[in-house]
């Protein structure tokens, strides 16, 4: 397809070449004649007849196309997951899973009730310690992990979480969202879970989310859409993950053929004396960038580190090598001047950098690169003294001219045009054999006129209703 597009774009410049015009003419004639031969052979009519024999004379479009739907009953899912609901713009409830009798109360306020201490700072992985000595400590921690995971709590979004002492009348936890980025993210994620409410980030000052446990007394009505939003936001974060070290295997990075190649995406697994090659594309690499809990991802990070280290070493080595090359070139330049002086002293032809010779092709106005005309005993050499050199240079020049002319001619005849000419000619030759076969196109009732356009079945019946007598003798007839 790309060759055809480039071919059509070059049509104005193509037609200037006689050879291209001939190729275009042969291609068009071959394609037209091939289509005529195939139509005359009856192959297309025979295929249409077999598809429609015995059916109605009208066409049906979309016979196998149906509009279907599926209904998801969320009532089977929501009782087993935390159910969020909103009381007002600042108070929210998160009922525990399995239709628990308790709920986690969330309050967005500018009041600070807890202060930072060395023992009361928590994070999403150990949030359950804020609900210690509670009867449902495990489910409370699980529910809060779901909620914080829905807020996309990660190393970029890390609001401070402080645990409180319930026995002293304090709340279970306090999340500091005073920072503008933290407040905006909490507001956007909670609005998706609980629904639309007033933005608390408009008031510039301290902002906290106070978390406490209360009894569930139907303070607010639940919505299955809120539960589904909470599920969707945790769909890829609550999978059970196990990580085991398989020291029985040894992995090495290689290319698709098994050759060691640091920086590739193929791993060769060795198990005793056999090996297995596995290649991973950009999907696996992107997955590793998202989730780092696998040995494969750790190994890629290690290889990436080594590759960067090698690249840095190569850059430093290249810099040192460039400095060495510069110094050597300077020495060579000085050495060249010394050699020319020595050649002059020992009567050997040398270059005085004043006169140069080259081979010029007057027909194409092309010349070779100038070369130094050597000097001996204070005078320039005769042409016969370096005849072999300029003859060899002329051969190289002619070869270069012919090569350029060949490349220019090849460039004026696109490869797509040659392909079209070849395949159209092959298509035409193939259609000649089909035309000679004279493929039959329909069934004919013996002794009567041709039943076209009626399509008779094998028992001489047509769905159009004209031929109703079954079992009449038939014969195959070709295109008339």
Swiss-Prot record:
Q: Which residues are glycosylated?
A: 88, 126, 176, 352, 360, 377, 382
The alphabetized UniProt keywords are: Disulfide bond, Fusion of virus membrane with host endosomal membrane, Fusion of virus membrane with host membrane, Glycoprotein, Host cell membrane, Host endoplasmic reticulum, Host Golgi apparatus, Host membrane, Host-virus interaction, Lipoprotein, Membrane, Metal-binding, Myristate, Transmembrane, Transmembrane helix, Viral attachment to host cell, Viral envelope protein, Viral penetration into host cytoplasm, Virion, Virus endocytosis by host, Virus entry into host cell, Zinc
Residues binding Zn(2+) 1, per UniProt: 57, 454, 462, 464
User: Residues bearing covalent lipid (N-myristoyl glycine)?
Assistant: 2
Q: Which Gene3D superfamilies match?
A: 6.10.140.1590, Arenavirus glycoprotein, zinc binding domain
This entry's Gene Ontology molecular function terms read: metal ion binding
A Pfam family (short name) is Arena_glycoprot
**GO terms for biological process?**
fusion of virus membrane with host endosome membrane; receptor-mediated endocytosis of virus by host cell; virion attachment to host cell
User: Where are the Cytoplasmic topological domains?
Assistant: 34-58, 441-480
Question: Where is Zn(2+) 2 annotated to bind?
Answer: 442, 444, 450
- Give residue spans on the Extracellular membrane side: 2-17, 59-419
Q: Name one GO cellular component term.
A: host cell plasma membrane
Does the keyword section mention Zinc?
yes
Q: Where is this site: Important for GP-C-mediated membrane fusion?
A: 33
TM regions (residue ranges): 18-33, 420-440
Site annotation (Cleavage): which residues? 58-59, 246-247
Taken from the UniProt record, the cysteine pairs bridged by disulfide bonds within this chain are: 85-220, 130-163, 183-201, 266-279, 288-297, 351-372
Query: Could you say which protein family the record assigns here?
Result: Belongs to the arenaviridae GPC protein family.
According to UniProt, the name of this protein is Pre-glycoprotein polyprotein GP complex
Q: Which gene encodes it?
A: GPC
């Amino acid at each position: 397809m790309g060759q055809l597009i480039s071919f059509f774009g070059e049509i104005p410049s193509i037609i200037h070449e006689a050879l291209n015009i001939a190729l275009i003419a042969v291609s068009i004639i071959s394609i037209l004649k091939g289509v005529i031969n195939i139509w005359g052979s009856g192959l297309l009519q025979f295929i249409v007849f077999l598809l429609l024999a015995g059916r109605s004379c009208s066409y049906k479009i979309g016979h196998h196309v149906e509009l279907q739907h599926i209904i998801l009953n969320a009532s089977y899912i929501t009782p087993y997951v935390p159910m969020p609901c909103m009381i007002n713009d600042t108070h929210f409830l998160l009922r525990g899973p399995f239709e628990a009798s308790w709920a986690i109360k969330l309050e967005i306020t500018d009041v600070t009730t807890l202060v930072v201490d060395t023992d009361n700072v928590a994070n999403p992985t150990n949030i359950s310690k804020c609900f210690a000595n509670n009867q449902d400590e495990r489910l409370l921690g699980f529910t809060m992990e779901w909620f914080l995971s829905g807020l996309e709590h990660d190393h970029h979004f890390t609001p401070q979480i402080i645990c409180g002492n319930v026995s002293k009348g304090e709340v279970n936890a306090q999340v500091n969202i005073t920072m503008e980025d933290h407040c905006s993210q909490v507001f956007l994620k909670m609005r998706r879970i609980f629904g639309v409410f007033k933005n608390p980030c408009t008031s510039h000052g301290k902002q906290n989310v106070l978390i406490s446990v209360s009894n569930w007394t139907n303070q607010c009505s639940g919505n299955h859409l809120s539960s589904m939003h909470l599920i969707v936001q945790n769909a890829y974060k609550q999978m059970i993950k196990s990580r085991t070290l398989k020291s029985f295997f040894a992995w090495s990075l290689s290319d698709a053929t098994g050759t060691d190649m640091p920086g590739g995406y193929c791993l060769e697994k060795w198990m005793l004396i056999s090996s297995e090659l596995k290649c991973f594309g950009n999907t696996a690499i992107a997955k590793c960038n998202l989730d780092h809990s696998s040995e494969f991802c750790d190994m890629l990070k290690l290889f990436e580190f080594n590759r960067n280290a090698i690249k840095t070493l190569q850059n430093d080595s290249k810099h040192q090598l460039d400095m060495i090359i510069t110094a050597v070139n300077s020495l060579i330049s000085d050495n060249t001047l010394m050699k020319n002086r020595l050649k002059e002293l020992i009567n050997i032809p040398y270059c005085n950098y004043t006169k140069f010779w080259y081979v010029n092709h007057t027909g194409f106005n092309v010349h070779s690169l100038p070369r130094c005309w050597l000097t001996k005993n204070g005078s320039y050499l005769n042409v016969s003294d370096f005849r072999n050199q300029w003859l060899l240079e002329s051969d190289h020049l002619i070869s270069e001219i012919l090569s350029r002319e060949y490349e220019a001619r090849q460039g004026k005849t696109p490869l797509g045009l040659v392909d079209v000419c070849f395949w159209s000619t092959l298509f035409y030759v193939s259609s000649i054999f089909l035309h000679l076969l004279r493929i039959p196109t329909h069934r004919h009732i013996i002794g009567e006129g041709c039943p076209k356009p009626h399509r008779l079945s094998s028992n001489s019946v047509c769905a159009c209703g004209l031929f109703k007598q079954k079992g009449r003798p038939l014969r195959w007839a070709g295109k008339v």
